[in-house]
UniProtKB/Swiss-Prot annotation:
A Pfam family: HxlR
GO molecular function: DNA binding
Annotated organism of origin: Fusobacterium mortiferum
Superkingdom in the source lineage: Bacteria
Function noted in UniProt: Potential regulator of the malBH genes.
Keyword Hydrolase: no
Location of the HTH hxlR-type domain: 12-106
Name of the molecule in the record: Putative regulatory protein MalR
Keywords: DNA-binding, Transcription, Transcription regulation
Amino acid sequence: MIDLERKNKYKCSIEYTLSFMGGKWKPIILWHLGTEGIHRYGELKRKLDGITHKMLAQQLKELADDNLIIRKEYPQVPPKVEYSITEKGMGLMEILNLMHKWGQEN
C-alpha cells in the first residue's frame, strides 16, 4: 500500500524510494535478508562489520515500520527474534541486485 502522505513529500520518485532504503546499512540488511533468508539479530550483527548495536536496532525498527521486513518474536527464554524480508522489501531486490552487479564490475 502506498503511503500517499509520505510520497507527496518528495518531488522525485527516487527520493521517495531512498526514504525507505537510503543510508549505509538498510540496503545491506535488505540484501542479506533477500538473498539469504531469515536471520536473527546476532547473525545480522556479525555480517555488518562496524555497525553498532544501537544503529542495527534502529535500522531494523525503521525497516519493520516501513513494512520492508518482518520482526517475529518467539515467546521463549532466552528471547528469540527472527527477521525476514516482506514482499514489499523484495520489490527492492532488483535495485539491490543491480547495485551488487555494478559493485562487482567496477
